[in-house]
A protein has these predicted regions:
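Residues on the lipid-exposed face of transmembrane beta-strands in outer-membrane beta-barrel proteins
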Residues: 1, 8, 68-72, 83, ...
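Solvent-exposed loop/turn elements at secondary-structure boundaries
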Residues: 2-61, 80, 84-117
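Conserved small-residue
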Residues: 22, 112-115, 129-227
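Outer-membrane beta-barrel signature, preferentially recognizing the C-terminal barrel domain
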Residues: 34-80, 109-132, 167-174, 226-232
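Extracytoplasmic gating/loop element in the C-terminal half of outer-membrane beta-barrel translocons
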Residues: 253-332
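Transmembrane beta-strands of outer-membrane beta-barrel pores
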Residues: 10-14, 85-91, 128-130, 143-149, ...
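Flexible, surface-exposed loop regions and adjacent strand-edge segments
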Residues: 23-29, 98-106, 155-164, 263-272
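Repeated loop/turn-to-beta-strand initiation elements of outer-membrane beta-barrel proteins
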Residues: 77-81, 122, 133-135, 243-247, ...
Length: 332
């Protein structure tokens, strides 16, 4: 008879680690150079302002966590499978309410229990072990998928839907849509104004998402995924024969993006050198290049250093982590 085990758990837990000890009382802070109450023997006497408003209703963050799983073994225990589903809904998270108007005063921050994040995912693992005469072999794998959605975080209302963090996964990359490079001064004159620095042929062109005639922070959109993979997986396999064995372990990740640093994208960063892959840069004779024009001036290069689809790339991978060849000595 096959082995079958069902399991489930549900509960609510609290977390007070992010709650500052005395924020429920507010805070007064000295302002010696801004608010002067008088002078004592040539020394300015500063006043105090309330830079953090009191919030006596603060409480700890809460999480409702659901886990459902199954363990089974089939075919005379040669096949074992484990599958689990989880759901983690966090609420009353301790975050700054950026919707509080500055009209209430010179307030540094006002934290409330208004944050909410929902997460869910699955974990799977399977293993097959068997023998054929003097041969033994196994093959197994693991698979994990998780994602989340920011429901509320106290962010201010945004003029465009693509600027909102709410409704999007945490850690998602945001940047500009690169549309290649300017190839002439005529293209620059006919294009939206790029507000980062003066541009010239060979600089990166960005898409004007909101169609207002200029490229600025209002044109930043979600691009790719975050730096933490949504999918992680592994494959392990092996074969044995009369004391000899070969085993291998593969690891992989998917649905992950990475923003490459300046030293990878821009030659001569921090007084460095130029790498071989950076030689594929724009010139009037080589307009179908991978990188923008060559320059050593940081200010001139500011336009080309923006976070964009030019430097945020797919970071999926599959690698062979270990490969082992072994022989077990006989006991006699």
């Amino acid at each position: 008879m096959p082995y079958l085990k069902l399991k489930a758990s549900y509960g609510q837990v609290g977390n007070s680690s992010g709650v500052d000890a005395f924020y429920y009382r507010g805070r007064m802070w000295p302002q010696n150079e801004v608010y002067i109450t008088g002078v004592n023997m040539g020394t300015k006497l500063g006043g105090y302002i309330q830079d953090i408003l009191p919030n006596p209703g603060l409480t700890w963050e809460k999480a409702r966590i659901l886990n459902i799983g199954i363990d089974t073994r089939l075919f005379s225990d040669r096949l074992s499978v484990t599958a689990e589903f989880f759901k983690d809904n966090r609420h009353d998270m301790y975050v700054v309410n950026n919707k509080i108007s500055s009209l209430v005063g010179n307030v540094k921050e006002f934290k409330q229990n208004i944050g909410k994040i929902n997460s869910h995912g699955v974990d799977l693992s399977a293993m097959w072990n068997s023998n054929i005469a003097d041969w033994s072999y196994f093959i197994g794998g693991t698979f994990s998928y998780s994602t989340n959605e920011l429901i509320a975080n106290g962010e201010v209302d945004q003029p465009y839907e693509w600027l909102k963090n709410q409704g999007r996964p945490l850690g998602e990359n945001r940047g500009y849509i690169a549309k290649g490079f300017f190839n002439s001064w005529e293209e620059i004159a006919a294009s939206p104004v790029q507000t980062f620095s003066d541009v010239q042929p060979g600089d990166v062109r960005y898409e004007d998402i909101n169609k207002d005639g200029q490229i600025d922070v209002n044109d930043m959109v979600p691009i790719g995924y975050g730096d933490i993979p949504r999918i992680m997986y592994g494959i392990n396999l092996g074969v044995g024969y009369k004391g000899f064995s070969i085993t291998a372990l593969f690891q992989g990740a998917a649905k992950v993006s990475h923003q490459y640093s300046d030293i990878v994208m821009n030659p001569f960063t921090d007084n460095g050198t130029i790498f071989e892959h950076q030689l594929d840069y724009w010139t009037p004779e080589h307009q179908n290049a991978t990188f923008p024009r060559l320059t050593t001036l940081d200010n001139a290069n500011l336009n080309n250093r923006q976070i964009s689809t030019l430097n945020v790339k797919d970071a999926d991978f599959l690698r062979l982590k270990t490969l082992e060849v072994a022989y077990d000595l006989p006991t006699k």
